[in-house]
A protein has these predicted regions:
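Short, hydrophobic/glycine-enriched beta-strand segments
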Residues: 2-8
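Glycine-rich N-terminal loop/short-helix segment of MobA-like nucleotidyltransferase
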Residues: 10-25
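Short catalytic helix/loop segments, enriched in acidic residues and glycine
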Residues: 21-38
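Phosphate-coordination/substrate-recognition cap region in phosphate-metabolizing enzymes
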Residues: 39-130, 139, 190-214, 239-245
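Active-site-adjacent alpha-helix immediately C-terminal to a catalytic or transition-state-stabilizing loop
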Residues: 3, 61, 69, 75, ...
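Acidic, His/Gly-rich catalytic cores of divalent-metal-dependent hydrolytic chemistry
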Residues: 227-246
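Active-site glycine-centered loops adjacent to acidic/histidine catalytic or metal-binding residues
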Residues: 8, 83, 181
């Protein structure tokens, strides 16, 4: 069985280096191209997909749709879960990461971005950016709406989905694609690979590059990004540097 994890293509706020979280921004032209390339990579590898799951945010949904059209997967069969949404960045949402580093320091921004259990400053329930003010999130129980999450919080939010999902795909066998976000995918990797709190802080997932994980009897027996190692390291370094002063 193969599990393919794919971070959405470049979004408008990836391009402008802003904390995005639950803000529902669109893909850039490059992001669309990245999604197309990802779909073609799956074709080249002859990986047929049995299920596709994604979040309820447009940048992930549209990436999933682009990929599905390329690999001839029925778009109407794409399943969505809010639990796969990006980490909610609280009051940081909309702020430029480099400018935020100038104000609070690179160390603090790194803690907000990459620590396991330290959340960003939370937004107030009366804040206009609170998720309860957006129609897209109306079906989510208000008690579950985040106001600012650490990666630990994302894992707690994700686990009800994950426990059902891993059971489903194990029973089905075959190959399965999750199109989601940097931190929801990092949460999955922490659970799946049993990474320590420290190990997960150095995991950087580039946009639009499929990560193929081969699983046998609930054990990982192989994994690879569908990109050459040199290009992968360049992209991962770019992500690591996003919170630095420029």
């Amino acid at each position: 069985m193969k599990l393919i994890l794919l971070r959405h293509g470049e979004s408008e706020w990836n391009l402008s280096n802003q904390f995005t979280g639950w803000v529902d921004v669109n893909l850039t032209d490059l992001g669309i191209q990245e999604a197309q390339i990802a779909g073609n990579k799956l074709l080249e590898e002859k990986i047929s997909i049995n299920t596709i799951y994604t979040s309820i945010l447009n940048r992930a949904i549209n990436t999933a749709k682009i990929v599905s059209n390329i690999i001839s997967f029925n778009e109407s069969c794409i399943k969505k879960s809010w639990r796969l949404n990006e980490r909610h960045y609280g009051k940081l949402q909309g702020l430029n990461k480099s400018q935020t580093a100038k104000i609070y320091g690179e160390k603090q921004v790194h803690i907000w971005r990459r620590s396991f259990d330290i959340p960003p400053p939370k937004i107030h329930i009366k804040d206009k950016m609170h998720p309860s003010n957006f129609k897209k999130f109306a079906k989510i129980d208000k008690i579950n709406l985040p106001t600012g999450e650490s990666l630990s919080d994302v894992i707690i939010r994700l686990k009800p989905f994950w426990n059902n999902y891993i059971k489903e795909i194990t029973e089905l066998g075959g190959n399965h694609l999750i199109v989601a976000h940097s931190n929801s995918l990092r949460a999955i990797l922490k659970i799946l690979k049993n990474l320590t709190d420290k190990e997960i802080t150095s995991v950087n997932i580039p946009t639009g590059i499929p990560l193929v994980i081969e699983i046998d009897k609930n054990k990982i027996i192989g994994e690879k990004y569908l990109i050459d190692e040199t290009s992968l390291k360049v992209k991962q370094k770019q992500i690591a540097n996003q919170g630095k002063i420029k």
